Amino acid sequence: MLYIFNSFDNMWVDFIEQTKSFKVSVNNYFYYLNKIKKLFTYLNDLRKHILKKYVYTINHKRIAINYLYFSMVTGLSGAALATMIRMELAHPESPFFKGDSLRYLQVVTAHGLIMVFFVVVPILFGGFANFLIPYHVGSKDVAYPRLNSIGFWIQPCGYILLAKIGFLRPQFWRYYDKTSFSFPFLEKMKYNQYKEYKNDYLFYLDFLKKEITDDHSFFWKARKVIKLPQYSVFSFVPLKLMMWKTMINYPESFWYAASRVVQSRRKKVFVTKCSARTLTTAGWTFITPFSSNIKYTGVGSQDILILSVVFAGISTTISFTNLLITRRTLAMPGMRHRRVLMPFVTISIFLTLRMLATITPVLGAAVIMMAFDRHWQTTFFEYAYGGDPILSQHLFWFFGHPEVYVLIIPTFGFINMIVPHNNTRRVASKHHMIWAIYVMAYMGYLVWGHHMYLVGLDHRSRTMYSTITIMISMPATIKVVNWTLSLVNGALKVDLPFLFSMSFLLLFLVAGFTGMWLSHVSLNVSMHDTFYVVAHFHIMLSGAAITGIFSGFYYYFNALFGIKFSRMFGYMHLIYYSGGQWVAFVPQFYLGFSGMPRRIHDYPVVFMGWHSMSTAGHFITLIGIMFFFLMIFDSHIERRAATSSTLGLPRWYKRISYYIFKIRYLQHNKAKMNGIPGSTVRLMLIDRHFAEFEVFKK
């Protein structure tokens, strides 16, 4: 009996313990369930916060920072394409592309267009212009904030199309590259036999079936027979569901079908042995007839390229229209005609915005005419039917050469802000500096022909373009001399923006001198198609323009993000990036003197030494870019507060005059701005030593 009671007691104890453990497990379950619920609530709130802060925002400062982040991403993709190019050229016998010269040309095309249209332009006119102009003209925001947001979100559309050109394999586009960052957008449709049945019997697109196709040469005589394995089939789906999927997954099918329908009226078959239909080999300059004729370039890729440039042009047009209207309608009373109150960087940006307003429609008209020539059988650039292929080069370079000044003149503004800040004295002859950039910009409209010495221009045109190109060195010389004089007799404070400015000055001098040599017709004829030209414009754009942008970025870093930048990573960025530029592009001058042609993926072994050095310089530059992103991450993680110490006691005696200068300079500016009727003054912090007073309406 005792045994039974003990057993019952043990069973009861076990039951109580199991109940307790069950309660504990239930409590733990609800505890972790509550934690998961809080986590999902936090993630949902974070998603709403990110959408509200970055996607739905119409604030000019946030949109400007979005432009900067976007340009960082596109810059990395452009650098990846440049790495492919340098790895191909590091050694003869085509080590990277395995002899595929067309693929090499496609990568070069995408690299050039990404760097010009989706890196430098968004940084300057989407980032800095959107952030600074409302401050400097005295408005609370731009004239059309929602239009400003639309202009930003058009940029990624064009970039995705262009990245699709650069990061895909040379096969037909139904086979996408899984190593590409864009592969989620390129998932191919599943094979459907029923759709193929309807495609064959309802639409009877027999020329899109898998079959052997004759290849015709330029003389309309069959030379050989090529096989097109697994040729893509036009999928039959409803129109509303078909359009986006077709352009993303099967662009060659869509454009090839449309072009063949029109071309059949002229009884021509545009199939060639020159290039694969999905490759863009016309280059970033849209050389005709390669870009205007399906006979020479990709059936779908060149059209996607044209559409990408149109998207970039629409975004740029929205930006410069919005900012120019802001300047015209929202500027302070008295500010509109008193240029002396406006900072130099804003004067430079407004000048280049007006330049963009005149040259962007020209490029848009040129690429639209190319699209018409390709698909609607117009003959703007078709010589056999009365067109002029040289006209497209005139249109492109009328845009292309002023575009160089559009990219370099805003960096002049950054230098003119940094030099007086670091040297405790104003810029030498500010009015001459302003007139110099105006003369440089207006003369830039007259020299586009020096890119076309080899197309058959007569000697009078060559002489005119050469003379004006030489004359354009005078305003550039005025600027360099005034910057040098601004450094004399001052209490110089050497910091990171100032060192980037000096690096910019050296790179700009070398790029300008080498450009002046190219202005001479006799030298240009022998050097035009060599690596000398590649070195010249890369030192001007990748060297001078990007270095000037970095100087402005570090100068306005505290104003942009409200924190101080990491000095250690910043100085490493300066050393490696500037050093890498010299090591990468100076050897290319010697390659040009030796006769190494550009746009060629292979070369004799005699050029391997200079090419290897140039490739090493490229990787040194990539290390500098790595330090730049480390600086961004470290600055945002540490979040050191940007505090003003303008009135602090200086450590060194030579800084006494520096602080006195800044105090007097700020007091002078504040007195001038308070004199404008209907205005008040606010403070925009630049760095821990310096700030600017800006005006805005009451």
Curated annotation (Swiss-Prot):
Cofactor note: Binds 2 heme A groups non-covalently per subunit.
Binding site for heme a3: H536
Positions annotated to bind Cu cation: H401, H450, H451
Domain of life: Eukaryota
Residues given in the record as Fe(II)-heme a binding sites: H111, H538
The protein's assembly and partners: Component of the cytochrome c oxidase (complex IV, CIV), a multisubunit enzyme composed of a catalytic core of 3 subunits and several supernumerary subunits. The complex exists as a monomer or a dimer and forms supercomplexes (SCs) in the inner mitochondrial membrane with ubiquinol-cytochrome c oxidoreductase (cytochrome b-c1 complex, complex III, CIII).
Residues holding O2: Y405
Binding site for Ca(2+): E88
Residues annotated for Mg(2+) binding in this entry: H528, D529
A GO biological-process term: electron transport coupled proton transport
Name of the molecule in the record: Cytochrome c oxidase subunit 1
Function, as annotated: Component of the cytochrome c oxidase, the last enzyme in the mitochondrial electron transport chain which drives oxidative phosphorylation. The respiratory chain contains 3 multisubunit complexes succinate dehydrogenase (complex II, CII), ubiquinol-cytochrome c oxidoreductase (cytochrome b-c1 complex, complex III, CIII) and cytochrome c oxidase (complex IV, CIV), that cooperate to transfer electrons derived from NADH and succinate to molecular oxygen, creating an electrochemical gradient over the inner membrane that drives transmembrane transport and the ATP synthase.
Position of the 1'-histidyl-3'-tyrosine (His-Tyr) cross-link: H401-Y405
Transmembrane stretches, start-end: 65-85, 113-133, 147-167, 304-324, 349-369, 395-415, 434-454, 468-488, 498-518, 533-553, 574-594, 613-633
GO cellular component, one term: mitochondrial inner membrane
Entry's Gene Ontology molecular function annotations: cytochrome-c oxidase activity; heme binding; metal ion binding
Pathway noted in the entry: Energy metabolism; oxidative phosphorylation
Gene name of this polypeptide: COI
Membrane topology value: Multi-pass membrane protein
Cofactor(s) this protein cannot do without: heme; Cu cation
